[in-house]
């Protein structure tokens, strides 16, 4: 995994790390929220056979062409390099996704979070970054002033930037990006509505947010039973519109069926659905991923479906967290075969 952190609005030297003091780390969940796709490939796998590596990737992403560029004073000349470097660091959007795979050297992508704050994403050999069309961003090399990247395009290679301003704001790509950014999160059972369907993106905030939701639901439905389905699934890959996890794609309709069964048993207002998207870059190869180590979730693989009902003494419990108020009745990686109608 690479590193990402917040930086100030203005920086003295764009090629420094420019961390805040104290450092404020970002996360892949924050990047995912604004549509950034990140994946790391073995740099040797790429550099040993670029053509053999890139052709399957082009097909998967439905892109048509690529080129390789080397940004350095030695390759371009000092004057041309600095001119391009300044252009790349102007805040801008593109009308197509910007797809970059780092081959050699290092650099920084700066992207805006949902509150318009800058996040700096370190980009190293093997890192593949997709910046969605319409998203404000910028790029710089580090102090080495030397980076080699593979660029992927939907059509013929081109790089057209629209600097931040009224003209960029009126572009369809910008308007479509903002519409996606502020749209309700989609889940396996429909759009999140903050009432019976929820999506919580940040693992480190889960307990606080879900405890508040659970207590509110228990108070609202104190005299009638309810059930909470928690679905942990690979987050959506913006390049395909589907989960990065193939098994999660297959599980999605079965999860919807199981939840429909819960609604039939408990009623629409007392069957609650929570989707927990799992970011690939945070999860794979990370034994300390919060959902893995969580005392109740105990995530072993995605997809995983849990169904919980209120603990018998939930009403008597005081200042406790959600997992003290609910009992796990179903835990499965195979939603197709799960029995959610025999809960006691």
Curated annotation (Swiss-Prot):
InterPro entries associated with the record: ARD (IPR004313), ARD_euk (IPR027496), RmlC-like_jellyroll (IPR014710), RmlC_Cupin_sf (IPR011051), Thioredoxin-like_sf (IPR036249), TXNDC17_dom (IPR010357)
Main location: cytoplasm
Molecular function terms, GO-annotated: acireductone dioxygenase (Ni2+-requiring) activity; acireductone dioxygenase [iron(II)-requiring] activity; iron ion binding; nickel cation binding
Record GO biological process: L-methionine salvage from methylthioadenosine
Protein EC: 1.13.11.54, 1.13.11.53
Catalysed reaction, written as an equation: 1,2-dihydroxy-5-(methylsulfanyl)pent-1-en-3-one + O2 = 4-methylsulfanyl-2-oxobutanoate + formate + 2 H(+); 1,2-dihydroxy-5-(methylsulfanyl)pent-1-en-3-one + O2 = 3-(methylsulfanyl)propanoate + CO + formate + 2 H(+)
Keyword Iron part of the UniProt annotation: yes
Binding site for Fe(2+): 92, 94, 98, 137
SUPFAM superfamilies (alphabetical): RmlC-like cupins, Thioredoxin-like
Binding site for Ni(2+): 92, 94, 98, 137
Entry note: cofactor: Binds either 1 Fe or Ni cation per monomer. Iron-binding promotes an acireductone dioxygenase reaction producing 2-keto-4-methylthiobutyrate, while nickel-binding promotes an acireductone dioxygenase reaction producing 3-(methylsulfanyl)propanoate.
Short name of any one Pfam family annotated for the protein: ARD
Keywords: Amino-acid biosynthesis, Cytoplasm, Dioxygenase, Iron, Metal-binding, Methionine biosynthesis, Nickel, Nucleus, Oxidoreductase
GO cellular component terms, A-Z: cytoplasm; nucleus
Cofactors required: Fe(2+); Ni(2+)
Pathway(s) this gene product operates in, as recorded in its UniProt entry: Amino-acid biosynthesis; L-methionine biosynthesis via salvage pathway; L-methionine from S-methyl-5-thio-alpha-D-ribose 1-phosphate: step 5/6
Subcellular location: Cytoplasm; Nucleus
Coiled coil regions in record: none
Family: Belongs to the acireductone dioxygenase (ARD) family.
Function per UniProt: Catalyzes 2 different reactions between oxygen and the acireductone 1,2-dihydroxy-3-keto-5-methylthiopentene (DHK-MTPene) depending upon the metal bound in the active site. Fe-containing acireductone dioxygenase (Fe-ARD) produces formate and 2-keto-4-methylthiobutyrate (KMTB), the alpha-ketoacid precursor of methionine in the methionine recycle pathway. Ni-containing acireductone dioxygenase (Ni-ARD) produces methylthiopropionate, carbon monoxide and formate, and does not lie on the methionine recycle pathway.
HAMAP family reported for this sequence: Salvage_MtnD_euk
Protein name: Acireductone dioxygenase
Organism: Leishmania infantum
Lineage per the UniProt record: Eukaryota, Discoba, Euglenozoa, Kinetoplastea, Metakinetoplastina
């Amino acid at each position: 995994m690479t590193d990402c952190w917040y930086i100030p609005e203005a920086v003295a030297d764009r090629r420094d790390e420019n961390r805040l003091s104290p450092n404020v780390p970002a996360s892949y969940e924050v990047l995912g929220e604004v549509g950034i796709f990140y994946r790391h490939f073995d740099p040797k796998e790429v550099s040993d056979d670029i053509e053999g590596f890139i052709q399957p990737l082009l097909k998967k992403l439905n892109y048509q062409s690529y080129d390789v560029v080397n940004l350095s004073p030695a390759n371009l000349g000092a004057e041309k390099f600095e001119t391009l470097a300044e252009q790349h660091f102007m805040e801008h959007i593109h009308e197509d996704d910007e797809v970059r795979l780092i081959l050699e050297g290092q650099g920084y992508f700066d992207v805006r979070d949902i509150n318009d704050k800058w996040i700096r994403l370190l980009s190293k050999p093997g890192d593949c970054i997709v910046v969605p069309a319409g998203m404000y961003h910028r790029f710089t090399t580090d102090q080495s002033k030397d980076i080699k990247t593979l660029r992927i395009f939907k059509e013929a290679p081109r790089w057209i930037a629209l600097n931040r301003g009224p003209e960029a704001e009126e572009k369809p790509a910008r308007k479509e990006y903002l519409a996606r950014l502020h749209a309700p999160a989609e889940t396996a059972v429909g759009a999140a509505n903050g009432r019976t369907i929820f999506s919580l993106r940040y693992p480190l905030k889960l307990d606080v947010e879900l405890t508040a939701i659970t207590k509110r639901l228990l108070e609202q439905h104190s005299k009638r039973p309810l059930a909470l389905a928690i679905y942990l699934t690979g987050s959506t890959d913006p390049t395909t519109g589907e989960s990065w996890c193939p098994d999660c794609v297959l599980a999605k309709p079965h999860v919807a069926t199981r939840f429909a069964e819960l609604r039939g048993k408990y009623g629409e207002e007392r069957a609650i659905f929570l989707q927990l998207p799992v970011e690939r870059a945070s999860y794979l190869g990370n034994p300390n991923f919060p959902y893995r180590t969580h005392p109740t979730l105990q995530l072993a693989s995605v997809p995983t479906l849990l169904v919980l009902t209120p603990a018998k003494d939930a009403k008597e419990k005081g200042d406790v967290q959600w997992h003290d108020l609910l009992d796990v009745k179903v835990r499965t990686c195979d939603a197709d075969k799960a029995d959610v109608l025999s809960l006691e």
